[in-house]
Amino acid sequence: MHRPLTRLIPAPQQDVKLAGLYLAQHLHNRGNSRHPFVYSNFITSLDGRIALAGEHRQSHEVPPTITNARDWRLYQELAGQADILITSGRYFRQSIIGEAQDKLPVSSQPDYEDIRQWRQEQGLAVQPDIAIMSASLDIPLESLAPYHKRKIYVFTGEQADPERVHLLEHNGATVMQAGAGHQVEGKRMIELLATEGYRSIYAIAGPWVFHTLLEARVVNRLYLTMACQLLGGSEYDTLLEGPLLSPARGMQAVGLYHDPFMPSGGQLLGIFEPVALTPTDPGRS
């Protein structure tokens, strides 16, 4: 972690330390009671793969050749600034069969002790709380047990199965309806989290959840690590899954860093913020 990154944006170009790079942005102070700060993070190959089918697996996995300790450090730093994490029911189904990438952050490993200490110094809870988006409410109850010290919310639609709702609530979760039918509406979910007092919200789920948040125009920042590798493969996930966004969501680079050390080929660390819509944007309603 001691080898530096090269900052490309903003100018001027210069070497910067990796450890502490994202913590220094103090994301937990950027939101307020009306507008929480919502951010997300992905690592992708150059050909857009964030997950691939794996042999002897029921679910896709982050490509092992692009995962690396330096990106993982920054992932933990982003989690370290969150009041609450947004994830999905899919994560907990993966977890119970041993296919989840890892436990939900912040990691308890010694390498991240400084992040946990930083949270304490900033007056944040020991760990961020958890918000689960789920239309089906198919969430294995035993998968929630490792997080019993955190507050757990489950967001679903108005037509959710009442028996599943009762079962989750009986096991300590707070179930909130945030949309008509079975699906969750991103804007309503963020509004409900704001009323619960959350100011910094970190979305760590997959392409469907990210699409839901983008569609609702609630994403304030995207952290995107681009591993300089080409992977191919016919079964894969990319950043977004869902209907065509109209208008397209323009994202401007507010930060860009080059890391030549990991993985093979190096990686680019991008920070993107949404471009404000103008009256002439195609597809604007």
What function would you assign to each model-found segment?
Residues 1-285:
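Enzymes that bind and transform nitrogen-containing heteroaromatic metabolites
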